[in-house]
Structures are given as structure tokens and as C-alpha cells.
Amino acid sequence: MAKVHILDHPLIQHKLSLIRDENTGSKDFRELVEEVSMLMAYEVTRDFPLQDVEVKTPVATMTAKAIAGRKVGLIPILRAGLGMVDGMLRLIPTAKVGHVGLYRDPETLKPVEYYCKLPTDVEERDLIVIDPMLATGGSATAAITFLKDRGAKSIKLMCLIAAPEGIKEVQNYHDDVDIFVAAVDDYLNDHGYIIPGLGDAGDRLFGTK
């Protein structure tokens, strides 16, 4: 069974509280999501292997450490996942960015795909699927299935907050995908919203309703 990693660093938790606050406007919301995403990326990449490299400093030559040739792909689930990309690219600037467009049918709460653009070599990359909310788990599960169908072998899922129902859904279908979250909330309401949650992440990021 894949692991659920709850990233409880004080900076992440402090900024997450500001993100949740209904009085936080779109500009601050975007900046906070970017900052938390960058901090979370630090933990998501913790298991990247290192290799020895020779480095010449101004005073001596030494053996230093460098990431051992990992090719990373960031896969935001549109549209809210876009708000997390820039923060992660600040730490992993060489990552390729693909996009999976899914929306949740308001009647069935099931994901519907409407767009996909991926790096051509997904099978060679460590992919990180990013979406602020893991609610029903339908969109994340569909996106991961979509990536596996195209040859992806290494996938992680990173979300700001998750509902227990969403975690269970992903684990039921993809027990090889580790899940990284800043918080696990209480439950989903009848409309599929995480409680207490943070509202609609896409609307708050982009100032829409």
C-alpha cells in the first residue's frame, strides 16, 4: 500500500491557515499556494538519489553531491493545479510540465477529460501529479490512470488538502502511488466539498465563481 505523507512543517501549516481563511483575496491566495507548493516540493523530492561529482571551489577541489540524473515531470490537473506549478519550478527548474484537463460533472461528481498535453517521454520521468484538493479522488485517480496508460512508471500525487474519501479512492486504484498532503481534513459534504477545506481552489486562485 502506498504511503500518505502529511507534511506538517510549521511554515507549511502557517501558510495553509492563511490559504483557508475566507478573507484571503485572490492575489494573496495565489502567492500562498505557490509558496506552500515550493515547500512541499522539498519533501516530495527527498528520496531523489545523489551521486558524487567533482567540484572546484575558489580554494580547492572536492567531491560534492548532485542529484543523479532524474528527469522530472510536473502534471497539474487543470485548472487549479496550475497554481502550484511555479512554486515547484522554482526548486526544479528543469522539470517538464504536462497538463491534464479534467472537470467534475456536477451531477455525478465523476471526472470528465477535456484536455491533455504531456512530455513525450513520460515513461522515463518521475511524475508528480499536482492538484490543491483531493476531494472525491476521482480526478486524481483518472489522471494517474491516464498517465499509466501512456507508459508512466513513477508517479507521486501532491495536494494541499485531502479528504479521507479521496485518499481511499486513490489507494483503491493506485496502491503504488505515494500521496503527499499538507493536511487531511474531516470529510466530504453532499456536494463533494472538503470540510472544513478552503472552498473552491480554482475560483479562489483565478477570481471566478
Curated annotation (Swiss-Prot):
Keywords: Allosteric enzyme, Glycosyltransferase, GTP-binding, Magnesium, Nucleotide-binding, Transferase. 5-phospho-alpha-D-ribose 1-diphosphate binds at R79, R104, D131, P132, M133, L134, A135, T136, G137, G138, S139, D200. The gene is upp. SUPFAM superfamilies: PRTase-like. Its EC number is 2.4.2.9. This is Uracil phosphoribosyltransferase. It comes from Desulfitobacterium hafniense (strain Y51). CDD domains: PRTases_typeI. Pathway: Pyrimidine metabolism; UMP biosynthesis via salvage pathway; UMP from uracil: step 1/1. Binds 1 Mg(2+) ion per subunit. The magnesium is bound as Mg-PRPP.
